């Protein structure tokens, strides 16, 4: 009987993965160990998890809920018990300077693997990353736009990079395997309707046409894509796999703009100091005001 672990099941990505595992109808013999910080929040989003499993013949997988911190190796030892694959969907909104959540979770997971009794079964980590960190996909975005996004989300991207370095070292050590999932901008966090997606092989340098990535993808389609990647993990170990939409996406740019603005201001504050940032902002406003006044005059 296969067993998965899912970290971050109450977030937009994790809940999309869990929803597909629960309702796709192809996971009857599957056990999913779900780690969340708040069990009540998970049950509010998925009330059916609080009810008895229908029957032995049900197509719904067996769900085991663990409550705790993803950076605690003791908790992860229990969550990873018998698991052959981990969906790593732990993240936080925005990109606050100094964030280390993803790399700390990676370090705790690797420590938990070291503590597991020998012989260990093989474990594959499906780590959500970003197309901005995949050279093949990032080059498709206008350079100025890419630089602005990387500046605004610098802290979150640095956290992801460090986590990936840890996974690479752990794979070399033989502790685990990993696959990196690189979506474009993600939209419609509360949506549940899928409209279609396609995986992108970023290792085939001759097939440029099929490496093209749309700029938007829904969380719902990302969840399904991550489940497909899980089913094909053996052929994708060590790769960065792109995901692109093939259908319409309900776009929520206002939410993303808020995250970019918050991250950008935080990065400016960190590099130049809040007072200097405020002075610069006032100068820009005065300059724009002067230009508008001169145009009207």
Curated annotation (Swiss-Prot):
Keywords: Membrane, Oxidoreductase, Transmembrane, Transmembrane helix. Induction: The genes forming the sterigmatocystin biosynthesis cluster are co-regulated and induced on oatmeal porridge or the fungal isolates were grown either on oatmeal porridge or in YEC medium (0.2% yeast extract, 5.0% corn steep liquor). Expression is positively regulated by the cluster-specific transcription factor aflR that binds the palindromic sequence 5'-TCG(N5)CGA-3'found in the promoter. Gene3D superfamilies: NAD(P)-binding Rossmann-like Domain. The chain crosses the membrane at residues 277-297. This is Averufin oxidase stcO. It is a single-pass membrane protein. It is found in: Membrane. One of its GO terms (biological process) is sterigmatocystin biosynthetic process. PANTHER family: FLAVIN REDUCTASE (NADPH). Pfam families: NAD_binding_10. Belongs to the avfA family. It is an enzyme of class 1 (oxidoreductase). One of its GO terms (cellular component) is membrane. Averufin oxidase; part of the gene cluster that mediates the biosynthesis of sterigmatocystin (ST), a polyketide-derived furanocoumarin which is part of the most toxic and carcinogenic compounds among the known mycotoxins. The first step in the biosynthesis of sterigmatocystin is the production of hexanoate by the fatty acid synthase (FAS) units stcJ and stcK. The polyketide backbone is assembled by the non-reducing polyketide synthase stcA by condensation of the starter hexanoyl-CoA and 7 malonyl-CoA extender units followed by cyclization and release of norsolorinic acid. The gene is stcO. It comes from the Eukaryota. InterPro entries: NAD(P)-bd_dom, NAD(P)-bd_dom_sf, Polyketide_Oxido-like. Pathway: Mycotoxin biosynthesis; sterigmatocystin biosynthesis. GO terms for molecular function: oxidoreductase activity, acting on the CH-NH group of donors, NAD or NADP as acceptor. Its EC number is 1.-.-.-.
